[in-house]
């Protein structure tokens, strides 16, 4: 019986290891240029931001309570870093959230950074983004320097690790990002297919 338990434990640990490795392999290392329109129908390309010291891409939602819990934090981080050469791009890829809803949500929540609509979740698919909010920090060559969560708690008062801020501070100091990957948490992106 003991040997059976050890055998089953070994299988479980091996499966867990492969699942973890597979999840890590799913992260993109470099983004491709893309074109999307914002809620005012203005077209943007990722390359429009190539002169930035860092480009923060945040997959966001209007209806997700987790993403909405981060609205004020996203805006605070944007305000803190916008004059330091950091570009911010919000991307809404949820099929059920219209451009008008995205526009209204941005105005209601005072989100002043660029917010683009990914109509057929093409960009979410290319980034392999799974949830909202989910962050990708790129350099001017579109290499992914950080991927994951904004911080470690849905409740602002419980935050212990400000992962996005930490990554941005290291980038702006010319350092290598210490923690390049964290687990993003939130609502799944509602895809077309």
Language-model-detected regions and their locations in the chain:
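A short beta-strand-turn-helix
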Residues: 34-54
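Short active-site neighborhood of thiol/selenol oxidoreductases, capturing the structured segment around
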Residues: 47-68, 168
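Structural microenvironment flanking redox-active thiols in thiol-disulfide oxidoreductases
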Residues: 68-109, 116-126
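Short, internal strand/loop/helix patches
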Residues: 105-149
């Amino acid at each position: 019986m003991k040997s059976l338990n050890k055998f089953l434990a070994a299988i479980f640990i091996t499966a867990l290891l492969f699942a973890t490795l597979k999840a890590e392999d799913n992260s993109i290392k470099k983004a491709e240029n893309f074109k999307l329109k914002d809620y005012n129908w203005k077209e943007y390309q990722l390359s429009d931001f190539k002169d930035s010291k860092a480009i923060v891409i945040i997959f966001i939602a209007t209806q997700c309570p987790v993403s909405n819990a981060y609205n004020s934090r996203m805006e605070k981080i944007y305000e803190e870093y916008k004059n330091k050469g950091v570009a911010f791009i919000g991307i809404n890829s949820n099929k059920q959230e219209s451009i008008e809803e995205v526009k209204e949500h941005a105005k209601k929540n005072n989100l002043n950074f660029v917010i683009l609509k990914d109509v057929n979740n093409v960009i979410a698919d290319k980034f392999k983004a799974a949830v909202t909010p989910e962050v990708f920090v790129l350099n001017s060559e579109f290499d992914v320097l950080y991927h994951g969560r904004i911080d470690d708690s849905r409740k602002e008062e419980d935050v212990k690790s400000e992962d996005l801020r930490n990554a941005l501070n290291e980038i702006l100091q010319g350092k290598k990002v210490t923690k390049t990957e964290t687990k993003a948490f939130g609502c799944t992106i509602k895809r077309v297919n």
